[in-house]
Swiss-Prot record:
The keyword Nucleotide-binding applies. GO terms for cellular component: nucleus. It is an enzyme of class 2 (transferase). Belongs to the IPK1 type 2 family. GO terms for biological process: inositol phosphate biosynthetic process. The gene is Ipk1. It comes from the Eukaryota. Residues 1-20, 87-111, 201-226, 391-416, 514-565 are annotated as: Disordered. This is Inositol-pentakisphosphate 2-kinase.
Length: 621
């Protein structure tokens, strides 16, 4: 491929060669009649279309009979543009030929549709490779070529649309047809109908309705109608949509001098603080920023929202069940546009005009403990692993067995004891969770010297506590890892004769210290030391004592700056939150954060609370 590059534009030659060897897949557009198996004589207005939602670029319409949704791109139509700018463009409209104007607009619309839909399909393919097939639904390109059908769609949903969104319409001629995730798939209806036919559900009427002979088209349709009514008697279908927002932090020091972007008219009045407060409070440039909590106050000031919510994306992406439950409580109490609840594919709770109140949601829809059950179910779904961990454990055990077979017998015995102790302590620390692993000031974990019996008792108790956890085990990883906490307990006994009796205690204490420092994956192994290694260990202890004395004399601001670095909470590798977080970081981490000068004028010192409690947003001055 490199030999065929052009001398003038090598990049272009390579790009053309890649397109020739790896052509983009061709997607063909089909009409609704072909995709939904409708009669050719049926018109579009005979199909039930329900307005679902819309954003800045797309309209979403539901087809409840087919459990599908239409995603239609929207733009400012020529009719609305002419109505808004009729006076200003009157001279241009008279001078320009009418036929030329209409043909150019039609060509531009068709070109936009031809280019947009394949781009959407390619984007969906990329999302499938990044997130997985279990999180991304397939789509089909649907063609709506008739202008009368597009006009009817716009007029049919105009009354349900927000007034602020009426400046854009669906001008076609293409859209996307996707599954409606607010309803159970059609395979579930077939499964429930079969269960009712066998009498498994205990609904005799449903069983009788599902047995029909099915002779003829009319009888088959009647049987399906009876089955659907019987399925509905089993209960309602609820769907909860969450828009999590940005779930990662950005240090103020990584932003391009936010305080230099402050408007010249903004005057800051520093708060009077004592010397002790200045030492205890970290610098604003070293604290973490939460973009969502920052933008909430700006929206409140501009009148886009009526009240501040208590939701913070950091709680939802923390991986800690208690914090995730707090985030769900905040979303349910003040959903704004970040949470919506559907009942049988109908939107019943959200920020729309006809939404029910939170009291009605908690008393009528999800009364009593059902609301608690729903929130715990959401947390379990968000933290669910979409792989089988048993296979990985089996592979890891096979590899460890092969390594142990190759080692000598005495070393193998000591190594097995060390690995057992390290595994117990690591499982205990990971099971307790990040909220229960607290590091002292400076990020240094002080590991006490314990005996083998005490360490074994504590680690087994921690492991027993870990088994009572309801959700997936979560551990917290500090970005600043101090070497002293990890190496202070690595020094073995100076005498080689005492090593055989204390190897288990030393390994357990070492693993405990490392787990407290990193709260996660770091594994430590202790092997029998020679006299030369013992001497080197003694010299390392002396150097560590000297370094500790030097560290005590370090400025307090450096130690505090290390504590205020961003913390990354470890989520399960293949859960949906981790997938979303990876995608957010992939898109945004390489781009500088742009905050409006208006935001800085509202709050000169910035929103610098690492947890971003909403009640503190107004007190940041």
């Amino acid at each position: 491929m490199t030999a065929e590059r052009g001398p003038r534009s090598p990049g272009t030659g390579q790009k053309l060669r890649l397109r020739a060897t790896e052509p983009m897949p061709q997607w063909t557009a089909k009409n609704l009649h072909a995709l939904l198996d409708l009669p050719a004589a049926m018109e579009l207005r005979q199909i039930e279309l329900i307005y679902r939602a819309e954003g800045n670029a797309n309209l979403v319409l539901a087809l409840p009979q087919f459990k599908k949704v239409l995603r239609l791109p929207k733009m400012i139509s020529s009719r609305l543009r002419q109505a808004a700018h009729q006076r200003h463009e009157l001279a241009d409209e008279v001078a320009r030929p009418e036929g030329q104007r209409v043909s150019s607009e039609r060509a531009g619309t068709e070109n936009a549709g031809d280019l947009t839909m394949p781009d959407f399909m390619a984007y969906i393919g990329i999302m499938r490779r990044l997130l997985g097939n279990e999180f991304v639904c397939g789509a089909d390109i649907v063609a709506i070529p008739k202008e009368d059908d597009r006009f009817w769609i716009n007029e049919h949903i105009r009354a349900q649309r927000p007034v602020s969104r009426l400046d854009k319409e669906f001008v076609g001629p293409f859209g996307l047809l996707l599954p409606d995730v607010t309803q159970l798939p059609a395979t579930f209806d077939v499964l429930l109908a079969n269960l009712q036919a066998k009498g498994t559900t205990g609904d005799e009427s449903g069983a009788a309705a599902g047995v029909g002979d099915g002779g003829g088209v009319g009888r088959g349709a009647g049987t399906r109608t009876k089955n659907r009514s019987a399925v509905r008697r089993l209960g309602d279908t609820y769907a909860i949509e969450i828009k999590p927002k940005q779930g990662w932090l950005q240090l103020a020091s990584d932003v391009n001098d936010l305080f230099d972007l402050m408007p010249s008219g903004a005057v800051t009045k520093p708060k009077e603080t004592t010397c002790n407060q200045e030492e205890n409070e970290p610098s604003a440039r070293d604290k973490c920023w939460c973009r969502f909590c920052s933008m909430q106050l700006l929206k409140m000031h501009n009148g886009k929202i009526k009240r501040l919510g208590h939701y913070c994306p950091l709680d939802l992406f923390s991986g800690t069940p208690s914090r995730m439950l707090d985030a769900l409580d905040a979303l349910l109490a003040c959903p704004q546009n970040n949470l919506r609840v559907f009942q049988n594919s109908n939107l019943i709770y959200g920020d729309h005009a006809n939404s029910i109140s939170f009291d009605e949601l908690s008393s009528r829809v999800f009364p009593g403990e059902i609301m608690v059950l729903i929130k715990h179910l959401l947390v379990a779904c968000l933290l669910r692993e979409y792989e089988h961990p048993e296979s990985k454990r089996a592979e890891g055990s096979n590899q460890s067995q092969k390594q142990q077979q190759e080692q000598p017998e005495p070393e193998q015995l000591n190594q097995s004891r060390v690995s057992i102790a390290a595994t117990e302590t690591k499982a205990g620390a990971a099971g307790i969770g990040a909220a229960n692993v607290v590091l002292p000031l400076g990020g240094r974990a002080a590991a006490p010297v314990v005996t083998a019996g005490q360490s074994s008792t504590r680690t087994r108790a921690a492991a027993a506590t870990a088994t009572t956890q309801r959700y997936t085990k979560v551990a917290r990883v500090e970005t600043t890892i101090t070497r002293q906490a990890a190496t202070s307990m690595a020094a073995g006994p100076a005498s080689s004769s005492q090593l055989s009796g204390n190897v288990l205690a030393t390994a357990t204490a070492t693993a405990t210290a490392t787990a407290m420092a990193t709260s996660g994956r770091t594994e430590t192994k202790t092997e029998p030391e020679t006299p030369a290694e013992a001497a080197s260990t003694t010299s390392r202890n002396v150097n560590q004592n000297e370094s500790q004395k030097l560290n005590r004399n370090e400025p307090a601001n450096q130690t505090q700056a290390q504590n205020n670095k961003t913390e990354i909470f470890r989520l399960p590798k293949n859960c949906v939150l981790q997938k979303i977080l990876n995608l957010q970081l992939l898109v945004k981490v390489s781009q500088p954060i742009k905050l409006l000068p208006k935001l800085l004028s509202l709050c000169p010192f910035g929103f610098v609370y690492s947890a971003c409690p909403p009640e503190n947003l107004g007190n940041c001055r």
